[in-house]
Curated annotation (Swiss-Prot):
Quaternary context: Component of the mitochondrial large ribosomal subunit (mt-LSU). Mature yeast 74S mitochondrial ribosomes consist of a small (37S) and a large (54S) subunit. The 37S small subunit contains a 15S ribosomal RNA (15S mt-rRNA) and 34 different proteins. The 54S large subunit contains a 21S rRNA (21S mt-rRNA) and 46 different proteins.
Known role: Component of the mitochondrial ribosome (mitoribosome), a dedicated translation machinery responsible for the synthesis of mitochondrial genome-encoded proteins, including at least some of the essential transmembrane subunits of the mitochondrial respiratory chain. The mitoribosomes are attached to the mitochondrial inner membrane and translation products are cotranslationally integrated into the membrane.
A GO BP entry: negative regulation of translation
UniProt miscellaneous comment: Present with 6700 molecules/cell in log phase SD medium.
Residue numbers covered by the propeptide annotation in the UniProt entry: 2-4
Keywords from the UniProt entry: Acetylation, Mitochondrion, Ribonucleoprotein, Ribosomal protein
Gene3D superfamilies (UniProt xref): Ribosomal protein L13
The protein, known as: Large ribosomal subunit protein uL13m
Compartment list: Mitochondrion
A Pfam family: Ribosomal_L13
């Protein structure tokens, strides 16, 4: 039997994925579920529910997000402080006017993440932008429409750490 442990450092390395909503044809829910899987790390071979091995996700062009039906006028987001009479209801239009289209995507992804202690850390790795410009361009190593691959400098640094 082989005693080789393998290069698990490559599997645990956090990659930066880029999702361009303008190029992506998926609706809000389908896009949010794919992003949630990447943030959780379920696409990795070393995934375990108790470990946070997910990747970063940068989403651009959120203003081009697709929703079906009349959700912009009819879907409501609610929050409650716990005190009587403090229920706050906001339509999707109001949320977009106040905080932008990225907030809608963040709320959708947040609802698809497990409700545990790792949720906030995973949401912090989601970076959303209404336009096409973002400050993380140099970090992005994987694109939503491509097979994810590990860049050579990252491979070399991880292999050097393992030696």
């Amino acid at each position: 039997m082989s005693q080789k442990i393998g290069h698990s450092g490559l599997a645990f390395a956090r990659l930066w994925h880029h999702v361009d909503v303008a190029r992506d044809k998926r609706t809000l829910g389908r896009l949010a579920s794919a992003i949630a899987i990447t943030l959780i790390g379920r696409h990795k071979p070393v995934y375990h529910p108790s470990q946070d091995c997910g990747d970063y996700v940068v989403v651009t062009n959120c203003q081009k997000i697709r929703v079906t039906g009349k959700k912009f006028e009819q879907k409501t987001y609610w929050s409650h402080s716990g005190r009587p009479g403090q229920l706050k209801l906001q339509t999707m239009n109001k949320v977009v006017a106040d905080k932008g289209f990225g907030e809608i995507l963040k709320k959708a992804v947040s609802g698809m993440l497990p409700k545990n202690k790792l949720r906030k850390q995973r949401l912090d790795r989601l970076k959303v932008f209404d336009g096409s410009e973002n400050p993380y361009k140099q970090n992005i190593t994987a694109f939503a429409h491509e097979q994810s691959s590990i860049p050579e400098p990252l491979k070399e640094s991880i292999f050097n750490q393992l030696k």
